[in-house]
């Protein structure tokens, strides 16, 4: 009977029936079964309930209004050069367009008819369909999921987007031999058509139409025109399969620049472990981590080389292991890349004008780490505090209860033309401030370390000119990294040094992948929404429904966004730090709620349930990710020659780290056979295959090449292509964009700002003749090396040794981790207060359970209470204790829920104003009772 009850709803997830057509009694129950079946992510996407029109927003605007006639048998024939172009709009409307309006282009000679009746699309109903009981079926429940039969959605690996079979992009591809396989993926259905088109394009008698989508022309044009590609159809299919495989394998991979949930085990399983995870921390660093786990607002200071970056990486891993959502950010892109995070502006949604435009996402984290905080303006810092308090509805709680961990050195490069945050009252009074003292970088050169400490506070050390080599003014050292004042001079110096080298240059272009979800989520709901639909109100209702049976941590994200002109997509982000049982429970409850949404008067109707959210991003998401990728220091074309000097921009081994310098000695073919054995793993293998196919198929390189670099440490290795990711945070609805490129850059010259936070391995030269006096500039430049033998400088002037007096005073007042005042007066973050309360209740519950077990053992060993045969007061006492124990466990869950409800009430009261405060409190109190 239960199987028959579940079967209709289970068929929804497999056979393409709309959720709204389910019997209401089984809608919320039967959908649970979908979450328990194995999902074939290789399918690109499995689709349910094919009533919702797909395609981009522009494509939807071209759709006819509901009720228009769309089933005429008008036909556009593709057979001659003049009539080759099918106007997609005309085909979709069922109207044959005049040939003179079509652009000149040549298509395959085979006659291909596209009938509007064959690609018709059922218009959206004005109201949900009537509920009809479904005939009971006994289809298979276990095993491979059955694919839907009526889907109009297709995953296009060429563009990385979901699209409709009636969309312009799909009709364009269908006209040249593409089709849809049984996994609802785009594939080469008619290879002969593609081969014939390629032959004609190579002869110059055919071309792809100029009005086709640019992404399709760019993806196919190079392969179809490349004479070295013997079978273009097979090459295109291979290229699409590599994109899909990469998407599948990296679905749960950690985002390298992620602001948030990075799964440690996934990194280790990926092959190359993060060396910062296994690094040995000194005693001082361990104490700082333990202090941070107490939940206080913190500032971690210290001079250059005291291990702040290593500490932040280890702290982030430790906090994530505790189940916390952590945002790793920095005020500069270079520093963000170095610590494995992103910029503060991107992560927190700060506009160019300094406004926080994504306020509703700021409470998505339990802790936010900000590196290089010396470059954070006081005004932005205080605005960040104000916005978090406002969003949390807690005006008296610093940063709304979110733990803020700041790191940096105010005696290094700071913010320009604005006061630093040391002048902020909140920073001075609410933050636990400590200073790291153990020197790590210059540990083997105490005299040089002492000289740097004097420069740090604005003093000119007597031993400086004696320990550092002095060169004539205007000197450029060919064998060194030259630190110059401006980016223009740096680019000019790098280009000139490269031109001086003999031989041909090799330009290696980075491969930019497809936008995708690389995290764990629930299924995605596609909803038809009304004009007055409000995302914030809907999210509140959805969270309320989910929390009816499953407790959702405050930082867990309900992702809801507009994807069509009259539709939204909704899913729940599942942090890897949460337990598997919790994630499974959320998946089940989410599908139950999907069957309840249509009964609520909130302006939304669920029309599709899609297990995978890949390809459901918006053009705005993609544009944002493309802008971020364009600014990434590694995702730029790299021109190299034999003999050129390069800087490693990632960590390959314990000895080859970010900042290592070497020389390109050769180029070899891009293949796994040439990759060092120590670096071979599944992750590198995917990057090599992806980059090789990209260079061959899309760039037209006859032989994809990789550089062989001899580093100053003595190691000579083939540097493999590396994957870099941007995005993966609430601003982009957790979508990420990946790029595979060479983790190298020319290392003849840099600005001082670009190397702040790095340890340079090799010779470094400072050309000071064109540098203007700037506070802390000389100290930052000279502290990039481990010993004075690496360093040389020219045009040194003692007047350039400058330090800000207020920053020097602040630094001297900092305490060490062993000499802190009482922490009782400092605020504690919300996650810590909640954890302490729950821990206390659970400890009481554990004690009661232990007491009951001991009582049962006295009466009969490990026999259950029900089988003890007790009677009278003893039996009544034990039964009462069992009831109390169950109630106590229930109280634990209610306490967690009440804390979150209290936070929501405070936020609501702050918004509604003082006039409605009393009314809101009364109603909230009644609801709690």
Swiss-Prot record:
ATP binds at residues 302-309. GO terms for biological process: chromosome organization; DNA recombination; DNA repair; telomere maintenance. InterPro entries: AAA+_ATPase, DNA_helicase_pif1-like_DEAD, P-loop_NTPase, PIF1_helicase. Residues 776-796 bind DNA. Its cofactor is Mg(2+). Monomer. DNA-dependent ATPase and probable 5'-3' DNA helicase required for the maintenance of mitochondrial (kinetoplast) genome stability. Essential for replication of kinetoplast minicircles. Involved in the segregation of minicircle progeny. Belongs to the helicase family. PIF1 subfamily. This is ATP-dependent DNA helicase PIF1. It comes from Trypanosoma brucei brucei (strain 927/4 GUTat10.1).
């Amino acid at each position: 009977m239960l199987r028959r009850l579940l079967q209709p709803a289970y068929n929804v997830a497999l056979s393409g029936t709309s959720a709204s057509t389910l019997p209401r009694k089984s809608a919320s129950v039967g959908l649970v079964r979908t979450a328990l079946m194995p999902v074939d992510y290789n399918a690109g996407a499995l689709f349910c309930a094919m009533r919702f029109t797909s395609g981009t927003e522009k494509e939807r605007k071209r759709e006819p209004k509901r009720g228009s006639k769309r089933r005429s048998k008008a036909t556009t024939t593709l057979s001659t050069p003049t009539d080759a172009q099918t106007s997609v709009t005309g085909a979709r409307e069922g109207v044959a367009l005049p040939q003179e309006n079509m652009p000149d282009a040549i298509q395959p000679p085979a006659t291909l008819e596209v009938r509007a009746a064959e690609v018709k699309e059922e218009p959206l109903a004005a109201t949900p369909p009537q509920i009809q009981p479904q005939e009971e079926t006994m289809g298979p429940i276990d095993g491979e999921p059955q694919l839907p039969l009526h889907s109009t959605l297709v995953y296009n690996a060429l563009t990385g987007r979901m699209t409709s079979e009636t969309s312009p992009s799909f009709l364009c591809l269908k006209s040249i031999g593409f089709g849809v396989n049984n996994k609802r993926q785009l594939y080469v259905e008619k290879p002969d058509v593609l081969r014939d088109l390629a032959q004609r394009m190579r002869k110059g008698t055919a071309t792809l139409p100029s009005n086709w989508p640019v992404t399709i022309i760019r993806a196919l044009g190079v392969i179809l025109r490349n004479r070295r590609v013997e079978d273009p159809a097979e090459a295109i299919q291979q290229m699409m399969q590599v994109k899909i495989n990469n998407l599948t394998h990296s679905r749960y991979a950690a985002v390298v620049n992620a602001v948030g949930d990075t799964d440690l085990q996934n990194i280790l399983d990926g092959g190359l472990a993060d060396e910062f995870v296994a690094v040995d921390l000194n005693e001082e660093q361990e104490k700082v981590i333990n202090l941070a786990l107490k939940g206080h607002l913190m500032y971690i200071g210290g001079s250059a080389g005291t291990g702040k970056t290593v500490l932040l990486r280890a702290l982030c891993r430790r906090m994530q292991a505790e189940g916390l959502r952590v945002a790793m950010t920095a005020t500069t892109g270079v520093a963000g890349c170095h610590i494995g995070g992103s910029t503060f502006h991107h992560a927190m949604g700060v506009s160019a004008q300094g406004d926080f435009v994504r306020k509703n996402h700021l409470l998505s984290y339990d802790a936010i780490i900000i590196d290089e905080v010396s470059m954070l303006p006081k005004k932005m810092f205080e605005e960040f505090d104000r916005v978090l308090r406002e969003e949390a509805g807690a005006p008296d709680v610093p940063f709304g209860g979110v733990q803020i961990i700041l790191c940096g050195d105010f005696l290094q490069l700071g913010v320009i033309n604005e006061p630093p945050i040391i002048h902020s009252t909140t920073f001075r009074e609410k933050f636990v401030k400590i200073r790291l003292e153990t020197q790590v970088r210059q540990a083997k050169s105490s005299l040089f370390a002492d000289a740097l400490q004097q420069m740090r506070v604005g003093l000119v050390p007597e031993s400086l000119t004696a320990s550092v080599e002095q060169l004539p003014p205007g000197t450029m050292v060919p064998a060194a990294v030259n630190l110059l004042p401006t980016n223009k001079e740096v680019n000019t110096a790098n280009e000139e040094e490269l031109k001086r080298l003999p031989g041909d240059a090799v330009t290696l272009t980075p491969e930019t992948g497809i936008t995708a979800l690389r995290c764990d989520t629930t299924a995605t709901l596609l909803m038809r929404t009304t004009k007055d639909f409000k995302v914030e109100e809907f999210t509140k209702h959805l969270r309320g429904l989910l929390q009816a049976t499953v407790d959702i941590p405050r930082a867990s994200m309900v992702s809801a966004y507009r994807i069509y002109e009259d539709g939204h997509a909704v899913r729940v982000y599942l942090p890897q730090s949460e337990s598997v049982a919790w994630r499974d429970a959320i998946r089940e409850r989410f599908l139950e709620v999907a069957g309840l949404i249509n009964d609520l008067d909130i302006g939304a109707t669920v029309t599709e349930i899609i297990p995978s959210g890949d390809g459901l991003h918006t053009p705005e998401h993609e544009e944002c990710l493309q802008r971020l990728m364009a600014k990434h220091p590694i995702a730029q074309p790299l021109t190299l020659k034999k003999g050129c000097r390069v800087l490693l921009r990632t960590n390959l081994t314990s000895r080859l780290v970010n900042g290592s310098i070497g020389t390109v000695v050769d180029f070899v073919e891009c293949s796994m056979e040439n990759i060092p054995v120590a670096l071979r793993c599944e992750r590198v293998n995917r990057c090599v295959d992806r980059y090789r196919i990209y260079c061959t198929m899309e760039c037209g390189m006859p032989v994809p090449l990789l550089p062989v670099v001899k580093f100053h440490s003595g190691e000579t290795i083939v540097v493999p292509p590396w994957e870099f990711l941007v995005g993966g945070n609430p601003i982009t609805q957790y979508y990420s964009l990946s790029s595979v490129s060479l983790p190298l850059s020319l290392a003849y010259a840099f600005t001082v700002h670009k190397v702040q936070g790095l340890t340079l391995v090799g010779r470094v030269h400072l050309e000071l003749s064109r540098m203007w006096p700037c506070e802390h500039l000389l100290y930052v430049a000279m502290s990039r090396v481990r010993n004075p033998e690496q360093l040389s400088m020219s045009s040194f002037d003692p007047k350039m040794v400058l330090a800000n007096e207020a920053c020097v005073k602040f630094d001297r007042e900092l305490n060490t981790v062993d000499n802190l005042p009482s922490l009782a007066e400092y605020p504690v973050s919300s996650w810590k207060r909640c954890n302490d309360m729950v821990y206390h209740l659970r400890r009481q519950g554990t004690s009661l359970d232990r007491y009951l077990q001991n009582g049962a053992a006295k009466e009969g060993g490990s026999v259950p209470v029900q089988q003890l045969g007790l009677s009278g007061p003893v039996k009544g006492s034990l039964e009462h204790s069992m009831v109390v124990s169950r109630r106590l466990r229930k109280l634990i869950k209610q306490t967690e829920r009440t804390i979150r409800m209290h936070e929501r009430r405070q936020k609501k009261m702050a918004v509604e104003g003082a006039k409605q405060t009393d009314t809101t409190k009364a109603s909230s109190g009644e609801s709690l009772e």
